[in-house]
Amino acid sequence: MAQKPLSTTAAERMNLVAQDEIWKYRLRAESEARQNWPAKWGYLTTSMKELLEGEEEPQTPKPKPELPSHFYVRPVSPMDKHIKILPSPPVPKTTQGFIGWRSGKPALYCLEKYSEVCSCKGAYARELCWPEQGVH
């Protein structure tokens, strides 16, 4: 049934017997689909009242038990207590110095705050077994 439909020019080149067989196949498939529809999609024809007849009324919610004090969530502490925001230095006067001026200050945005990254050039590429041409 999942056959590719024939174009009109291909159908005209076929003989009449083949066209008749294709027509019979399509009629048979349509008839089977019509017979199978109520079993597969019949629930779509029932009304909403009929669907809701068998349902019960919603139950009353159960009372929630009292939780111990150590289960409660503590209030959130302010971010300023944990994160220190340093003041920014003045913006450079030249346009060439403007690009990357914040990253050029080691005290401002140093990612290696607690320890330095000790890695030689291409160490990760060698772990991946890349050829030497892949290491820049």
UniProtKB/Swiss-Prot annotation:
In terms of domain of life, where is this protein from?
Answer: Eukaryota
Keyword Phosphoprotein tagged? no
Keywords, ordered alphabetically: Cell projection
Q: Which GO terms describe its cellular component?
A: cilium
In which compartments does the protein localize? Cell projection, Cilium
One Pfam family here: LLC1
Q: What is its main location?
A: other
PANTHER family assigned: CHROMOSOME 20 ORF85 FAMILY MEMBER (PTHR31909), SIMILAR TO PROTEIN C20ORF85 HOMOLOG (PTHR31909:SF3)
- Name of the protein described by the UniProt record: Ciliary microtubule inner protein 1
Chain's gene name:
Cimip1
